[in-house]
Amino acid sequence: RQVMAGLCFNEDCHCANAADTRRCLQEEAEKIAENIILKLPKLRKTLSTDVQAAFDGDPAAANLGEVIDCYPAIKALTNYRLAHELVLENVPLIPRMIAEMAHSETGIDIHPAATIGTHFTIDHGTGVVIGATCVIGM
């Protein structure tokens, strides 16, 4: 439903009438949701490299569980990586909302259109801004 709600902000659908538009949007949203679900294993693997990078780079990190549960960068990167996949699927609005949720919680602002490679972390990230045109580690 959320993907479909986001698609409603896209003005590219030129269906003949409202019923056709709704059906068209629903079919597109289902296809996008399926594509995202198929990408989840790769997304999980990428996030695990981010967790490992945070652990390896921080001598204060006691264990991976602490990194996952307590490090704001992991929250920001998790939201970014999901939002980025939605950007790649041309979903409007929803990726920015997901990124803003992490920004308000962590102080780390990562635009979902930015390109960030694997094994990435941000230590003490409050105030960090990564813009839409930024390419890191690619």
Regions found by a protein language model. Give the residues of each.
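Structural signal for interior beta-strand "rungs" in well-ordered beta-sheet cores
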Residues: M101-M138
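Terminal amphipathic alpha-helical/low-complexity segments used for targeting or macromolecular assembly
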Residues: R1-E100
